[in-house]
Swiss-Prot record:
Biological-process GO terms, alphabetical: regulation of DNA-templated transcription
First-listed, main subcellular location of the protein, grouped into a coarse class: cytoplasm
GO CC annotation terms, alphabetical: cytosol
Organism, scientific name: Chloroflexus aggregans (strain MD-66 / DSM 9485)
Pfam family, any one: Transcrip_reg
Keyword DNA-binding: yes
HAMAP family reported for this sequence: Transcrip_reg_TACO1
Name this protein carries in UniProt: Probable transcriptional regulatory protein Cagg_2594
Biased composition (Basic residues): 1-14
Subcellular localization(s) per the UniProt record: Cytoplasm
Keywords: Cytoplasm, DNA-binding, Transcription, Transcription regulation
Length: 252
């Protein structure tokens, strides 16, 4: 398993307890709310981003009533405060660039929490544009290789034929990257070929990765974990080269 895959597997395992599961449902609901509003429709057949958000919620056993409530909030049919999507930027130990995607009903609270987390964990918050230029918007499709008997090389060729511009293969997963605007087409082409897709989403991918020394890399990973644990933070992206060895050292 690659370092990035192993890191996300560990994070999912830590979300298994009740408190973290409640936090996960909150984050999934906000994804659905924002997707509904940005897509202008509560119908997943007409709103691809919403469809992906609902699929992810259901994969995590989120109750249907929670999903519907999040859609209604996105349509403005709820008395709850509006949710807005905000990006924050900064640097971690070792000069690691960090880009944070947040969803909040209180911008001041979220800004304060993000800034404090940077400052308490050896990082420094940055101004808008300070690191975002190091990332590009991509679609990411993940295939669980244990769910199929097909050869990874065959799946890699299928992904490229479907329109992928990069494919990373390891022992347990296939990570397929494509242009965000092509995600629906690539995903559907793979499904038509019987490829078992475990996840599909929009991400911000670092254009290049860096490898600071182990001390700084571990400290940067610790900062990333603390940021991911914030209630209003949906995703944290970085240009840290998260190797399997680094994750194993972090988790030991």
């Amino acid at each position: 398993m690659s370092g990035h895959s192993k890191w996300h597997t560990i994070r999912r395992a830590k979300s298994a307890n009740d408190q973290r599961r409640g936090q996960l449902f909150t984050k999934l609901a906000r994804d659905i709310t924002i997707a509904t509003r940005e897509g202008g429709s509560g119908d997943p057949e007409l709103n691809f981003r919403l469809r992906l958000a609902i699929e992810k919620a259901r994969a995590n056993n989120m109750p249907n009533e929670n999903i519907q409530r999040a859609i209604e909030r996105g349509l403005g049919k709820s008395n709850e405060a509006a949710i807005e999507e905000i990006f924050y930027e900064g640097y971690g130990p070792g000069g690691v660039a960090i880009l944070i995607e947040a969803a909040t009903d209180n911008r001041n609270r979220t800004s304060s929490d993000v800034r404090a987390t940077f400052n308490k964990n050896g990082g420094s918050p940055g101004e808008p544009g300070s690191v975002s230029w190091m990332f590009e918007q991509k679609g990411l499709i993940t295939v669980d290789l244990s769910a199929t008997k097909r050869d990874p090389d065959e799946l890699q060729l299928l992904a490229i034929d479907a329109g992928a511009d990069d494919v990373i293969v390891d022992d347990e997963t296939l990570e397929i990257y494509c242009e965000w605007t092509q995600l629906n087409a690539v995903r559907q082409a793979l499904l038509d070929q019987g490829v078992p897709i475990s996840n599909a989403e929009k991400i911000m991918r670092a254009k290049t990765l860096i490898q600071p020394d182990e001390k700084d890399a571990l400290a940067a990973l610790r900062l990333i974990e603390k940021l991911e644990d914030l209630d209003d933070v949906q995703k944290v992206y970085s240009n840290l080269d998260i190797t399997t060895e680094l994750v194993e050292r972090f988790d030991s």
